[in-house]
């Protein structure tokens, strides 16, 4: 039986409160209505679109965890982070991110997402990329969502933090990178200073 508009909107608010990452398409399927109906309901209820909801959750949840750069400077939207351990961000490839003729994402956007996530996962006031080894596995097209997963895997002999980042579209690996990160609070050894030596 089809729900009344009032009941649907009440359930819509409840569903989004429980899962702010749910898409309009998933909501439309759940409530057996069109995507346009969901968008109208959201507008009437002053519920922001998915992208804004993700940013709001990130601001509330991760503002105190990301120290090396402001959240608005991260390329993509952080959806999970454990400082000095792991982080996840999503990046929706739009028209402005692709080559006009081929509709393929420009590589620097995929690199920027991975690099900024590698910086964000470092729990320090200053984190810089000292070295990056990257590999573009397959082309990413307009309309695809890239999920980047960063994991702190260790340290180099010089005390740089190693961060592995793998980016996926669905379950398919599209980009991988190993980033050596300089950080300002490197633990001092026998009177060594923590200044950067390149």
Curated annotation (Swiss-Prot):
One of its GO terms (molecular function) is DNA binding. InterPro entries: DeoR_HTH, HotDog_dom_sf, Transcription_factor_FapR, WH-like_DNA-bd_sf, WH_DNA-bd_sf. The keyword Lipid metabolism applies. Residues 102-167 form the MaoC-like domain. GO terms for biological process: fatty acid biosynthetic process; negative regulation of DNA-templated transcription; negative regulation of fatty acid biosynthetic process. CDD domains: hot_dog. Keywords: DNA-binding, Fatty acid biosynthesis, Fatty acid metabolism, Lipid biosynthesis, Lipid metabolism, Repressor, Transcription, Transcription regulation. The keyword Transferase does not apply. Disulfide bonds: none annotated. Belongs to the FapR family. Transcriptional factor involved in regulation of membrane lipid biosynthesis by repressing genes involved in fatty acid and phospholipid metabolism. This is Transcription factor FapR. It comes from Geobacillus kaustophilus (strain HTA426). The gene is fapR.
